[in-house]
Amino acid sequence: MSEASDPRGHIQLSGPDSRKFLQGQVTCDMDLLTPEQSIKGAQCTPKGRIIFLFEASCDSQDNIILETHSSITEIAIASLKKYAVFFKTQITDISGQVATEKVTDLQRLRTGAADITAETSELFIPQMINLDALGYISFKKGCYTGQEVVARAHYRGAVKRRMHHLKIHASRLPEPGSEILNSEGKAIGHIASAAQADEASVEVLAVLADKSSDCTEIGVDGQTVSVTHLKLPYEIPTGP
């Protein structure tokens, strides 16, 4: 069985206002970014839904490169440009010009970090896919688009869905964004990421309603499958 590797896209922001612009747009604190230290974050809609995820790096001239899933690159650029009109920053697609380490879908999934793809853009708020546990969110920085929703979920404990690592006994790979049903046919969540584990099983990161997080059987993509719960490599926060 061949292991699929997730394709990466790259967006460059150059110009004197690039860092200031991103600071008002993304969940992480861009002031912590240095040429020696990358940083991970998300851009959200005003309603707190994730548009795309990224890992940011910069050079000594403060050109900033955002690495993201290739399927979301065009969406990410369009979203950034919508807010960049009053800033001196140039946003460019440089995909294919940056060398990156090859990571398989399964390797990435087993870190407990989901990708946001074209299919799942604007489907989740950050805490639903555990970005607070993964260090993608600064709760100390200033305002950014969607902050009110993200902060409310954090300080009021309003997160009713969380991402879980499941092994499902099926040979067919579910698509990201696929709806998950319980044994009664009721929607209880969505697939965030999926990867083939072996010929008879698939591992997924699934966002599930809290009351259904102990499910042992689910319906997804027209098939009913048994579920084994696997441990995430980090603890999910239980409070602010």
Regions found by a protein language model. Give the residues of each.
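Acidic, proline/glycine-enriched N-terminal capping motif
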Residues: 1-53, 58-61
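Acidic, low-complexity central loop/insert segments
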Residues: 2-5, 9-12, 55-112
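A generic structural signal for short beta-strands and their flanking turns/coil linkers
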Residues: 9, 39, 62, 87, ...
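Residue-level signal for inorganic ion chemistry
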Residues: 15, 66, 146, 185
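Hydrophobic side chains in well-ordered alpha-helices
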Residues: 21-22, 76-79, 162
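Short, solvent-exposed amphipathic alpha-helical segments in soluble enzyme
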Residues: 26-31, 81-85, 181-183
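Glycine-rich, small/acidic residue-mixed loop/short-helix segments
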Residues: 50, 129-137, 151-240
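Anionic-ligand-binding alpha/beta catalytic cores of soluble enzymes and soluble regulatory domains
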Residues: 102-167
